[in-house]
């Protein structure tokens, strides 16, 4: 499987770095199989940080091996379990089992607005899930432990 990570720097050896913000799937190194999504993120982060160059980092992972040898939490669609997991991580309240790898839909800016309406009580769970079904969602694979990072291999990078 080919994976991408958009950044303002080259990331040959991914590291787990604690962020000062809460993300969809919690702490980890975020990748996607969607090249365009990673390119878009690289450009956004470069513009926001005003340093570096928009960089598409390219990786490979033998998913059959990694998914077998690591603890994997997989969401095949943005369902109730996915919504609960993302909402708890975004609020910094997730207390469940820790996993090596987490795979599922990404809450981009548009989706995040919908989730925020849910977290603030404007939308209930049913309304939120119905709204998400009409959105085009991309995927993300998060490497959440040092163990999981051992399966990720840097293949190269492109300036975008």
Model-identified regions with their sequence ranges:
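Glycine-rich loop/turn
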Residues: 1-29, 37, 43-47, 81-83
